[in-house]
C-alpha cells in the first residue's frame, strides 16, 4: 500500500490490514463528512470489533485525473504534518482504509490501530 511505502521510507514497520478497521473506515467515509468526528469514528471502530485506540486521517477532494485516489489521499496526508505523523506513528500496527465517491468527490478515511491505547468512547 502507499501508506506502508511511506512508513518504510521513514523507518517504521508496515501496518497489517485489520478487517474491523477496514469496515469502520468504510462506514465513516460513507457519511460524506468533510471534518473529523472523533466520537463517531471511535464508536464505529468499536462497533466493528476494534476496541482499542485509533489514529485517523480524513481527506476530501475532487476525483483526480492524473493519479489514483489512493495516491492522492496519501499525498494529501503527507503534505500535512499531523496527518503525516498519523501515517508513520510507530505505536500503530494495524490499518483500515475506506473510500466513498459521491458526485465526483472522494471521501477517504485511514484508521491506524494501536492495541496498547484506549478507545475513549469504548
Label the predicted regions.
Residues 1-34:
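A short alpha-helix/helix-coil micro-patch that ends at or immediately precedes a cysteine
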Residues 3-4, 26-33, 59, 74-78, ...:
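Non-transmembrane alpha-helical segments in soluble domains
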Residues 7, 25, 58, 111-112:
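Bulky hydrophobic/aromatic "packing anchor" residues in well-ordered structure
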Residues 23-68:
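Short, surface-exposed glycine/acidic/tryptophan-bearing loops
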Residues 64-122:
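Disulfide-stabilized extracellular recognition modules
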Amino acid at each position: 500500500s502507499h501508506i506502508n511505502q511511506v512508513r518504510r521510507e521513514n523507518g517504521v514497520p508496515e501496518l497489517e490490514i485489520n478487517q474491523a478497521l477496514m469496515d469502520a473506515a468504510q462506514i465513516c467515509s460513507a457519511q460524506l463528512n468533510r471534518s473529523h468526528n472523533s466520537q463517531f469514528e471511535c464508536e464505529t471502530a468499536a462497533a466493528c470489533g476494534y476496541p482499542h485506540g485509533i489514529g485517523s486521517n480524513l481527506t476530501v477532494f475532487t476525483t483526480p485525473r492524473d493519479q489514483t485516489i489512493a495516491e492522492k489521499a496519501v499525498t494529501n496526508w503527507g503534505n500535512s504534518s499531523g496527518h503525516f505523523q498519523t501515517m508513520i506513528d510507530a505505536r500503530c500496527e494495524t490499518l483500515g482504509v475506506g473510500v466513498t465517491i459521491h458526485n465526483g468527490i472522494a471521501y477517504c478515511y485511514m484508521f491506524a490501530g494501536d492495541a496498547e491505547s484506549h478507545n475513549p468512547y469504548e
